[in-house]
């Protein structure tokens, strides 16, 4: 009779490695084996064995307690020996270096120093901001040569009565007319209802004998001709606009009177325009 282990096939590893002898003439196919006793592993006791149980045994079992009190120096708990505690003594003032002394005695002096530094810093920042704003505004203002052309002085004695003289002012022609008494009376007698741009003669002059105008036609910007036209004042040859001796539009396509600039008589013989 064959052994059960010899007929088990693939299940032989999971079956017990034993055989049972049966009386007969045949020899058993599988010899009986005796299981060997396993050797016990030997631990290296020189090296510590780290596990959850061994580490938990080294942990502190008592609760952590922190004590706080007056005039008690602070204590540092070192988790690692390579950590350095920062020292800010170089940034502290001499009055507060000693932790055992009260800082209330030196508080007034420290506050005064802080206020002084803050005040000086504020004044410096305000002064710098003022200079920056001044330079920025001055950079946008007109240059010296432009300001020189902003005003012009005219000597009135050089202009004879009944004549008109042209000057260049701010890139534009400037007309200064010395009117006769007849022209003054003639322009003062004009009714406002006859004018396209109603304006009295006395409203356009500061002295009746002097008329100061910008010589640019209000139609398309041409330069009129003095002492010409149907009204004895100014005539624009571009499109036929007629102005009187006061610079008021009387005939033609121009919609407005000639512009009167800002001027001031500094004396009887001098006028400043601008």
UniProtKB/Swiss-Prot annotation:
Changing residue 14 to D: In MC3DN10; loss of localization to mitochondrial inner membrane; the mutant protein is distributed over the entire cytosol and in the nucleus. It is found in: Mitochondrion inner membrane. It is a single-pass membrane protein. Keywords: 2Fe-2S, Disease variant, Disulfide bond, Electron transport, Iron, Iron-sulfur, Membrane, Metal-binding, Mitochondrion, Mitochondrion inner membrane, Primary mitochondrial disease, Respiratory chain, Transit peptide, Translocase, Transmembrane, Transmembrane helix, Transport. It catalyses: a quinol + 2 Fe(III)-[cytochrome c](out) = a quinone + 2 Fe(II)-[cytochrome c](out) + 2 H(+)(out). InterPro entries: bc1_Rieske_TM_sf, Globular_prot_asu/bsu, Rieske_2Fe-2S, Rieske_2Fe-2S_sf, Rieske_Fe-S_prot, Rieske_Fe-S_prot_C, Rieske_TM, Ubiquinol_cyt_c_Rdtase_Fe-S-su. GO terms for biological process: mitochondrial electron transport, ubiquinol to cytochrome c; mitochondrial respiratory chain complex III assembly; respiratory electron transport chain. GO terms for molecular function: 2 iron, 2 sulfur cluster binding; metal ion binding; oxidoreductase activity; ubiquinol-cytochrome-c reductase activity. [2Fe-2S] cluster binds at residues 217, 219, 236, 239, 241. Residues 187-272 form the Rieske domain. The chain crosses the membrane at residues 104-140. It comes from the Eukaryota. Its main location: mitochondrion. Disulfide bonds join 222-238. PROSITE patterns: RIESKE. The Rieske protein is a high potential 2Fe-2S protein. It is linked to Mitochondrial complex III deficiency, nuclear type 10: A form of mitochondrial complex III deficiency, a disorder of the mitochondrial respiratory chain resulting in a highly variable phenotype depending on which tissues are affected. MC3DN10 is an autosomal recessive form characterized by fetal bradycardia, poor feeding, hypotonia, hypertrophic cardiomyopathy, alopecia totalis, low mitochondrial complex III activity and lactic acidosis. This is Cytochrome b-c1 complex subunit Rieske, mitochondrial. The lineage of its organism: Eukaryota, Metazoa, Chordata, Craniata, Vertebrata.
């Amino acid at each position: 009779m064959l052994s059960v282990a010899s007929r088990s096939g693939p299940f032989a590893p999971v079956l017990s490695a034993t055989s049972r002898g049966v009386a007969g003439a045949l020899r058993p196919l599988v010899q009986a084996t005796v299981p060997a006793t396993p050797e016990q592993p030997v631990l290296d006791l020189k090296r510590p064995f780290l596990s959850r149980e061994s580490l938990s045994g080294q942990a502190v079992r008592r609760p952590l307690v922190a004590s706080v009190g007056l005039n008690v120096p602070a204590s540092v708990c070192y988790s690692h020996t390579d950590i350095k505690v920062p020292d800010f003594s170089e940034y502290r003032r001499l009055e507060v270096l000693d932790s055992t002394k009260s800082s209330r005695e030196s508080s007034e002096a420290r506050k005064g120093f802080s206020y002084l530094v803050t005040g000086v810093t504020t004044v410096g920042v305000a002064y710098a901001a003022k200079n920056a704003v001044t330079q920025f505004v001055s950079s946008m203002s007109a240059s010296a040569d432009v300001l020189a052309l902003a005003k012009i002085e005219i000597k009135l004695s050089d202009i004879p009565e009944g004549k008109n003289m042209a000057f260049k002012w701010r890139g534009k022609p400037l007309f200064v007319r010395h009117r006769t008494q007849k022209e003054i009376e003639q322009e003062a007698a004009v009714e406002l209802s006859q004018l396209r741009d109603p304006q009295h003669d006395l409203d356009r002059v500061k002295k009746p004998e002097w008329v100061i105008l910008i010589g640019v036609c209000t139609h398309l910007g041409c330069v009129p001709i003095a002492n010409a036209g149907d009204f004895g004042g100014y005539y624009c040859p571009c499109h036929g606009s007629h102005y009187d001796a006061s610079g008021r539009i009387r005939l033609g396509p121009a919609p407005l009177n000639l512009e009167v600039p800002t001027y001031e008589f500094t004396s009887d013989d001098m006028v400043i325009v601008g």
